[in-house]
Amino acid sequence: MSRLENFLDEQNRLTAFPAKRRVKLQALCYLAQKFEPGKIYTEKQVNVLLNQWHTFENPATLRRELYQHRFLGRQPSGAAYWLEPQQPTLEELQRKYG
């Protein structure tokens, strides 16, 4: 994840959400690793967790991207989130999105 390192501070928090798709996908893979398998999270808990791992104060964008790329599942109401048991790999995402 060498390109992603350019977006991490000394505490390994994302300092910006990368614009280039390849690095953005690396960032999503990185953030997905912070969630505990089998645990159900409220939206607020997801935001708190994401806020611990980025500095640009936009958990909604990160949460939405994690959901859209199928790292996180959620109830239709958005009341509960979880780490999907089958995570997409970086290679799968890069093939899909180029």
Where are the regions that the model predicts?
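Short helix-capping/hinge SLiMs at alpha-helix to coil transitions
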Residues: 35-39, 55-56
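Minor-groove-contacting beta-hairpin "wing" of winged helix-turn-helix DNA-binding domains
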Residues: 79-84
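Short acidic, hydrophobic short linear motifs in intrinsically disordered regions
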Residues: 37-50
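Short amphipathic alpha-helical segments
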Residues: 23-24, 42, 58
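Short, amphipathic alpha-helical interaction segments positioned at domain boundaries
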Residues: 89-98
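Short alpha-helical segments that sit at the start of domains
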Residues: 2-37
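Short amphipathic alpha-helical interaction segments
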Residues: 53-65
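A short, conserved structural fragment
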Residues: 68-78
